[in-house]
Amino acid sequence: MTRPVRLQDLRDYKKNNRPWAMLTTYDYSTTRAFVDAGIEVFLVGDSAANTMLGYSGTNQVSFEEMVMLTAAVVRGAGPAMVVADLPFGTYEASDEQAVRSATEMVRRTGAHVVKLEGGVRMASRIRAITDAGVPVCAHLGFTPQSMNQLSGFKVQRGAEKLTADVDAVVEAGAEMVVFEMVPADLAAELTARCPIPVIGIGAGNATDAQVLVWHDIANLPKGDHRARFVKTYAEVGSQLTCAARFYRKDVEARRFPAEEHTF
């Protein structure tokens, strides 16, 4: 798509049963590569805490770090849509805090949508942000920022609770919603009745879209544990290690720089 991707495009994709792919990305150069691959929607996730910054959990990434990463992605995204996570601690306290964080994220980065975790309990935050003119993506099911309350990584099976959460975020004005680690049959049922696009991660293949962390599809770093819902499409970790090793050996043997690399 040469013109900017719009929220109406995603609604049309849902109406026409056209699935679409979202990827996380955190920097300019990687984003450019994914634009060339035809990815139309990017998520600058708080997963950057682990994948890019080396923190032990997503709750450790700061607002300023997310602003820096998101701005870089927007500069590389071209016509693609960019969704930015609001990190833990930047929206939970009050509607006013949520609006400040969301508007600041959009103003400073150019992101098109902000994402936050929670359903019924965050409905007023979603409504306040939406009323302030910022589109919202909700995140339901397994919510990593609340992992301590959820007792770790577990599939979220509560149909009644998830249904109530979906209804709440839709009523609050969310433009899209992520289902994480939700049983496939439940995700399919809720996707069919949900009027906004549903993005799945570990939620079966009946959702309107799929999202994965790009490091997972590329097996980077090599050997890291991958969740069951991940499919590896390339061995980028191994390729990077090989490239760096060959470079090091060439330097040590004075094979690089060769004559063709010298002025």
Swiss-Prot record:
Residues annotated to bind Mg(2+): D46, D85, E117
Main location, first listed in the record: cytoplasm
Annotated active site: E180
CDD domains reported for this sequence: KPHMT-like (cd06557)
Keywords per UniProt: Cytoplasm, Magnesium, Metal-binding, Pantothenate biosynthesis, Transferase
A molecular function (GO) term: 3-methyl-2-oxobutanoate hydroxymethyltransferase activity
Record-level GO BP terms: pantothenate biosynthetic process
NCBIfam families membership: panB, PRK00311.1
Name of the protein: 3-methyl-2-oxobutanoate hydroxymethyltransferase
Organism: Corynebacterium diphtheriae (strain ATCC 700971 / NCTC 13129 / Biotype gravis)
